[in-house]
C-alpha cells in the first residue's frame, strides 16, 4: 500500500503565532492535493509532535488533551486521513528532521507523484529505501 505521512502544524495548518490550535487556518492547497492522493488509493497518516514539549512526551496526556482538538480540526476542514499518529519527537525550534523519503510541503503541492518519485530517487536510488 502507498502511504503518506503528513505533518500537522505548519503543513496542514498555516503557522501563525498566538493562534490557538483549534483556530489555525488550513493550508487549503495542500489539503486539496491530499484529497487527490486519497483518490489515487493512498493511505494517509497524520504524524504530529503537537504538544510533545508541553506534556513532556507523555502520550496519555496528549491523547486526552490534544487528540480531540486535532480530530475536531481535521473534521472541520474536511481533511482526509486514515490514522493519527501522535508522539513524533519534537526537534526543537532550531533543529530539523532528516529523512531520505521526505519532501517539503511546497514540493507536495507543486509536483505530481512521478516528479516526487524522481526527486526522492536523487537521495536514495533504491525503490525500497533500504527498508527490507
Task: Name what the model sees in each region.
Residues 1-132:
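Catalytic phosphate/metal-binding cores of nucleic-acid and nucleotide-processing enzymes, i.e., regions
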Amino acid at each position: 500500500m502507498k502511504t503518506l505521512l503528513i505533518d500537522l502544524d505548519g503543513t496542514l495548518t498555516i503557522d501563525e503565532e498566538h493562534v490557538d490550535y483549534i483556530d489555525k487556518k488550513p493550508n487549503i492547497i495542500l489539503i486539496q492535493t491530499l484529497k487527490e492522493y486519497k483518490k489515487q488509493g493512498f493511505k494517509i497518516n497524520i504524524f504530529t509532535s503537537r504538544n510533545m514539549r508541553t506534556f513532556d512526551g507523555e502520550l496519555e496526556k496528549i491523547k486526552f488533551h490534544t487528540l480531540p482538538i486535532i480530530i475536531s480540526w481535521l473534521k472541520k476542514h474536511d481533511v482526509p486521513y486514515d490514522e493519527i499518529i501522535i508522539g513524533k519527537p519534537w526537534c526543537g525550534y532550531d533543529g530539523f528532521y532528516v529523512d531520505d523519503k521526505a519532501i517539503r510541503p511546497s514540493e507536495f503541492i507543486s509536483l505530481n507523484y512521478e516528479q516526487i518519485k524522481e526527486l526522492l530517487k536523487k537521495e536514495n536510488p533504491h525503490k525500497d529505501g533500504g527498508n527490507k
